Every structure is written in structure tokens, then in C-alpha cells.
Amino acid sequence: MAQASNSRIKVGIVGGTGYTGVELLRLLSQHPHVELTAITSRKEDGLPVADMYPNLRGRVKLAFSAPEKASLTDCDVVFFATPHGVAMAQAAELLAAGTRVIDLAADFRLQDTAVFERWYKIPHTCPDILADSVYGLVELNREAISKARVIGNPGCYPTTVLLGLAPLIEGGKQLVDVQTLIADCKSGVSGAGRKAEVGSLFSEASDNFKAYGVAGHRHQPEIVAQLEKLAGGKVGLTFVPHLVPMIRGMFSTLYARILPQARDTDFQALFEARYADEPFVDVMPAGSLPETRSVRASNNLRISVQRPGGGDQLVILVVQDNLVKGASGQAVQNMNLMFGLPESAGLDQVAILP
């Protein structure tokens, strides 16, 4: 049963030392309906959170605790900001105690376990729970999320691609050629996480711009599965991610070929109508171009609809902060829905400029 909106939700975070973990802490420490009760890290057991993240001094007074010491089953909801495979190992125990689960990794994103195992190279150990889980893209699954016990929080790239293409294909619309969709996406280096890797070292990532995962990226099957669910049939997607030398931010340029019978469609009006009531999706005025800095540290996602030369190629530009709407902010948005809270609770931060 969803907790009443006038009581405080007891929240636990598993894996609080990475970038998505500290973003959860930043957002939840300002949330009017949340009580942070447990933050786990085996390596940092006993270390005050504020000692690792000084930006949280005076905001978060908890210390990290080893997972076995944390009373996670006493929480109303537990967020997993962990590597793939961790949430599925603990979900059954939490659910049995009445604790809800929001996983920021991929354990509950793909309903096909064979596809999951092929891309993530680990067995899926709780297919029964997976079948009961909900894909947590609020703007597409709001009603199901409000009733869910387990949420698979979407990946950062899928969030931009799905929200950028949904108005064109949902409900089987015959507006664009769904077999020739292209997603050309760029992410800041924080998307790679906080672990030490050569590719995200300053001397490697700075003053450099590169594509990666062109032959196949883990987010490809996630995007395709959700696009096909929206379209009601098979879709074809070319997805190419890139790494750009900035910390936060994601810019996705999406291409869709307009079908002959849809050439007279007002696509600007279509997008504006679709997202008119969405608190975190902003369709920019015709002719405007989005920038990643306009959404930095906020839960906002901005969309621009372009039709170069009035031709048959539609170009959709989408920006978000990969750590907020692309990860932790979206997870909090899901929590709000699950517990009957205002969707924007704790998420009304204005983007940082400059």
C-alpha cells in the first residue's frame, strides 16, 4: 500500500559512493517527505557521508554502513545505485518485508532474460520478480509506476531517445519510417561512473571527442524493446553513443524520415500537445535550439523539433542532465509516484548557470 503523502518515507540507498548515489543523496536530502535511514558501502563502512562528499555537510548526517549492518528491510523503499546484478540478489528479501525497490542498474529494464544475459553477461536470478517489475519512464508508464513494487529505472540514453521519439510512433502512428530511425547521442564522462578507468582520465577525455559502442551498446536492446512496445511492431534503430569532454550532460540528435502521408503534419504542435502537462519535459518554441547547460543539475529534459528546409527529414534534439533526469532524478520521480506524492516533490531545482 502506498504511504500517505503526509508521512515521511524511510529511504535506504545501496551503493551510495558513486555519482548516481551522491545525486540521490543530494536530491533526497532536500525532499520534504523523505527520511534517509541507511546508506551502504562495504568499503567505506563507518565513514560519515559528508567526509566523502563535503557538499552534503549539514544536509546528510548519516555514515556509510556495510550492507549486512544496514536495516534495509525497515525502509519503505530502497534505491540500488549499484552495478548490474546487485538488486536482483536482494530484491526478494526486501519485497517480502514490504519494501519497494528502485534499481538504477539494468536488472529490471529488460523483460527478456535471454536478451539481458546476452548483453550483461550474468544470469538473471529472479525472472518472477522481473515479470512483476515496471519500466520507470514516468512520461510513458505513469499509471503502472504508481502501482509498482519494483522499478527498473531507465538508462540515460534510452530516456532521451524514447521521449524524443514517443510522440511520433506511440499507438502505431504512421508518421515516420520506424525502420530507419537514427539516434546520435553524446554524453559527459560522468556517465561512465566514478570508478577509475583509463578512458575517463582527464588526460584521456579532455580535449577529445569519440564514439564508442558502435558495434553494439547495452542500451540498444532497451531502447528497441520500448520503441517496439510503443509502436506495436518491429522498429529499426541505428544508435551511436559518443563521449564528450564535459562532466554532466547529454545531447541526443534523433533522425526520423517523414512518411508521404504525414508531410502536412504540424510536428511542433504534436510534441507540444503530447508533453503539455509533463512537469519535466519542455518542448522549446519553434526554431529554438537546446543546450546541455540549460538543464545542468535539474530534472528537466528539453526537446526541440526541427525540419531542415521543410523536407522529409525530421530532426529531434533532446538534452538532459545524465545524472538527474537520466538517472537519480528520474528515480526520485518514480518514488514520488509510487508513494502518492506530488511528482515534482524534491525535484524543483533550477538548472545551474553558467
From Swiss-Prot:
A single Gene Ontology molecular function, please?
N-acetyl-gamma-glutamyl-phosphate reductase activity
Please state the pathway this protein functions in, per its UniProt record.
Answer: Amino-acid biosynthesis; L-arginine biosynthesis; N(2)-acetyl-L-ornithine from L-glutamate: step 3/4
The biological processes this protein is annotated with in GO are: L-arginine biosynthetic process
> What span is annotated as the signal peptide, if there is one?
none
Localized where?
Cytoplasm
Please state the Enzyme Commission number of this protein: 1.2.1.38
**Top-level taxon of the source organism:** Bacteria
Broad class of where this protein is predominantly found = cytoplasm
Q: Which GO terms describe its cellular component?
A: cytoplasm
Question: Its catalytic activity?
Answer: N-acetyl-L-glutamate 5-semialdehyde + phosphate + NADP(+) = N-acetyl-L-glutamyl 5-phosphate + NADPH + H(+)
**Keywords carried by this UniProt record:** Amino-acid biosynthesis, Arginine biosynthesis, Cytoplasm, NADP, Oxidoreductase
One family from Pfam that matches here is Semialdhyde_dhC_1
Enumerate the active-site residues: 156
Q: What does this protein do?
A: Catalyzes the NADPH-dependent reduction of N-acetyl-5-glutamyl phosphate to yield N-acetyl-L-glutamate 5-semialdehyde.
Q: Which HAMAP family match?
A: ArgC_type1 (MF_00150)
What family is this protein classified in?
Belongs to the NAGSA dehydrogenase family. Type 1 subfamily.
NCBIfam families noted in UniProt: argC (TIGR01850)
Q: What is this protein called?
A: N-acetyl-gamma-glutamyl-phosphate reductase
**Originating species:** Bordetella pertussis (strain Tohama I / ATCC BAA-589 / NCTC 13251)
Please name the taxonomic classification of the source: Bacteria, Pseudomonadati, Pseudomonadota, Betaproteobacteria, Burkholderiales
What is the primary gene name for this protein? argC
